[in-house]
């Protein structure tokens, strides 16, 4: 349980990060609720600092907004899972859970994206059948890397006027 207590700091970061986009969030109340949650988990215990942060560090590798939304979706899901195992009769836990559910509904479903990445990592690239399929798909993959999406192309080209 002590490993989870350090994650409460990350929960604070998520709530603050989305505070500017989710105007309905009352950050002062959430901070108070998170402080109560920290007390529930005894997060001032000395072992919380051992080994450094376990979740905040992961956010450093995700720099673009859409990337961050994917990883934050996963993190919010983790916190919701963590709160499932707590006393939901406490008002502060109920409030934090409600706010996390609201945030989760505004985030993309990162589970599918993470599963796709894991499936790619599991591909046996030394398998001849996989190599054949991969070779067959290589050109279309390269096209996706080189060609900008059609929506960007349309916006980046100025409209041509008819010289009638």
From Swiss-Prot:
GO cellular component terms, A-Z: extracellular space
GO annotation terms (biological process): adaptive immune response; defense response to virus; humoral immune response; macrophage activation; response to interleukin-18
Signal sequence annotation: 1-19
Domain of life per record: Eukaryota
Glycosylation-annotated residues: 42, 61
Alphabetized UniProt keyword annotations: Antiviral defense, Cytokine, Glycoprotein, Growth regulation, Secreted, Signal
Gene3D superfamilies: 1.20.1250.10
Statement: the UniProt record of this protein carries the keyword Magnesium: no
GO molecular function: cytokine activity; type II interferon receptor binding
Listed Pfam families: IFN-gamma
InterPro entries named among the record's database cross-references: 4_helix_cytokine-like_core (IPR009079), Interferon_gamma (IPR002069)
Cellular compartment(s): Secreted
Entry similarity comment: Belongs to the type II (or gamma) interferon family.
Assembly behavior: Homodimer.
Function statement: Produced by lymphocytes activated by specific antigens or mitogens. IFN-gamma, in addition to having antiviral activity, has important immunoregulatory functions. It is a potent activator of macrophages, it has antiproliferative effects on transformed cells and it can potentiate the antiviral and antitumor effects of the type I interferons.
Protein name: Interferon gamma
Name of the encoding gene: IFNG
């Amino acid at each position: 349980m002590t490993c989870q207590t350090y994650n409460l700091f990350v929960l604070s970061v998520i709530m603050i990060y989305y505070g500017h986009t989710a105007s309905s969030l009352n950050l002062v109340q959430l901070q108070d609720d998170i402080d109560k949650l920290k007390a529930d988990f005894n997060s001032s215990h000395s072992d919380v600092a051992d080994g450094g942060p376990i979740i905040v560090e992961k956010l450093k590798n995700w720099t673009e907004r859409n990337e961050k939304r994917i990883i934050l979706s996963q993190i919010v899901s983790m916190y919701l899972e963590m709160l499932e195992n707590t006393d939901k009769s406490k008002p502060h836990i109920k409030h934090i859970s409600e706010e996390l559910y609201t945030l989760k509904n505004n985030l993309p479903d990162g589970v599918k994206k993470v599963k796709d990445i894991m499936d790619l990592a599991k591909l046996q690239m030394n398998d001849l059948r996989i190599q054949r399929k991969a070779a067959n798909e290589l050109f279309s993959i390269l096209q996706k890397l080189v060609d900008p999406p059609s929506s960007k192309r349309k916006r980046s080209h100025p409209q041509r006027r008819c010289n009638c």
